């Protein structure tokens, strides 16, 4: 994993200032093994992308993509749809999200990506970034 991240870092053009980082999100970050995650606790501590306070992700989701019902134990989550259409279930309520639509979830609120209707690009922010924070929910327990 660390070798893969090092290789991605070398391919990602970034400029590091004293108190900032400017970069370009490459296709390898979005579509590669990091699956769009730009920063978070999962990057090695010495990486410019290692953060414990926040996770940021840009993802392109293909048509018919789904994700199981889950919640985040300790993290606030914000997601905005930049393009396309996606159906989400949030705490049991169904929502069709289109460009400009967003949701904000408090820790413990359940989310379920029902289906990507049109290929979509999303920006997700979760804070803080905590290992083992995603808890899967068995539908029969819901």
Each predicted region: which residue ranges?
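Ligand-binding loop in jelly-roll beta-barrel domains
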Residues: 52, 107-133
């Amino acid at each position: 994993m660390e070798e893969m991240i090092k290789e991605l870092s070398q391919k990602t053009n970034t400029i590091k200032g004293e108190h900032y980082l400017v970069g370009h999100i490459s296709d390898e970050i979005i579509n590669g093994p990091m699956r769009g995650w730009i920063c978070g606790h999962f990057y090695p501590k010495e990486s410019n992308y290692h953060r414990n306070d926040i996770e940021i992700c840009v993802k392109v989701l293909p048509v018919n993509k789904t994700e199981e019902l889950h919640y985040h134990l300790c993290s606030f989550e914000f997601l905005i749809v930049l393009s396309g259409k996606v159906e989400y279930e949030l705490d049991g309520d169904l929502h069709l999200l289109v460009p400009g639509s967003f949701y904000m979830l408090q820790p413990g609120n359940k989310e379920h990506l029902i289906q990507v209707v049109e290929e979509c690009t999303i920006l997700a922010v979760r804070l803080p970034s905590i290992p083992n924070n995603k808890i899967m929910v068995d539908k029969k327990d819901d």
